[in-house]
Amino acid sequence: MSRVGKKPVTVPSGVTASVEGQTVKVKGPKGQLQFVVHDDVDVKLENGEVTVKPRYETNRARALYGTARAQVANLVEGVTKGFEKKLEITGVGYRATLQGKNLQLALGYSHDVVYTIPEGIAITVPKPTEINIVGIDSQVVGQVAAEIRSYRPPEPYKGKGVRYANEFIFRKEGKKK
């Protein structure tokens, strides 16, 4: 059994949660999110807490209910605090600029990479080598950060590229003479 799944998700004041069938809807000060839970998982809202339990005693249901509980907890955290990912750009001439709804990245290619910012995501560039991604849906924030990082992932020899702010790059030694 999942230790994460056993804990109920408390709904703080200022946040309203509702369960309609397999859909969990959460509305808070930062916005509104919803998540459709798998059919093998049972979700209930009682006394300001969302509880998640496996509907059947199958391996699949036991595997899914901890994930479903974590998703519901992310919904509640997203509408109250929001999520943020920070990226750092390392390399000579590598930089990022905002142009309206687009993020323009100079990453050493013959052309600039233009990334269109999706709805519900706010990107700021405090320095040309830093990118902050903020949003209420943790899955979308993580996906946007991963897509931007994928344009030039950090390489192990010089460490050039786009990396997460807390990411450690294992450096390799160059070839020897």
Curated annotation (Swiss-Prot):
Entries under Pfam families matching the protein: Ribosomal_L6 (PF00347)
Protein name, entry field: Large ribosomal subunit protein uL6
UniProt keyword Phosphoprotein present: no
Annotated source species: Rhodopseudomonas palustris (strain BisA53)
HAMAP family: Ribosomal_uL6_B
GO cellular component terms, A-Z: cytosolic large ribosomal subunit
Family stated for the protein in its record: Belongs to the universal ribosomal protein uL6 family.
Keyword vocabulary terms for this entry: Ribonucleoprotein, Ribosomal protein, RNA-binding, rRNA-binding
